[in-house]
Amino acid sequence: VGPGEILTVMGPSGSGKSSLLAYIAGFLAPAFESSGSVLVNGDDICSLAAERRRIGLLFQDPLLFPHLSVAGNLRFAMPRNAQHKSQAISDGLNDIGLAGFDNRDPGTLSGGQASRVALLRLLLCAPNAVLLDEPFSKLDTQLSEEIRTLVFDKLRASELPTILVTHDKADAEQAGGEIRTLL
């Protein structure tokens, strides 16, 4: 998958879509046997621990920490050596239409707002590649379209190679890349 490209993986439940993502991200359960290589920027990342792979993940649920503010959630994901974190957070929130949400409790966010914060958290962690696991499936049709457009636009603009797992043909069509089906 090239920079800014989105590969879509579709298939019925139990076909191995989520297992594929777990393998790439480095958290496949030891009960599973796997082999092969995963190249990111020309480097095989399979021997690296999950936290060293620099893979960004976006799931069905935003998975925001309830005990941290919106800014705290974003700061948590940023590399330790990142400079000007507060400014990056403020600029990022402004960029996704959530200016001034820094101190908000994540529990007070709507589904769309929480999805936007989860996307920004992913981008601020400075990944080398991104995995999307049904990230729009819990949103209503209109909100799903809006968030899908935002996510795909931001990932393309960031030139991040992305793999999307979905059951939704609208997701695959809007991703605009190659579609692979697992059986």
Model segments located where?
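Catalytic Walker B motif of ABC-type/P-loop ATPase nucleotide-binding domains
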Residues: 130-134
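ABC ATPase NBD coupling module
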Residues: 43-59, 80
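Conserved ABC ATPase "signature" region
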Residues: 84-102, 150-153
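A short, proline-enriched helix->beta-strand linker immediately N-terminal to the Walker B motif
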Residues: 124-128
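Hydrophobic anchor residue at the start of the ABC signature
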Residues: 119
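Conserved ABC ATPase signature
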Residues: 105-109, 113
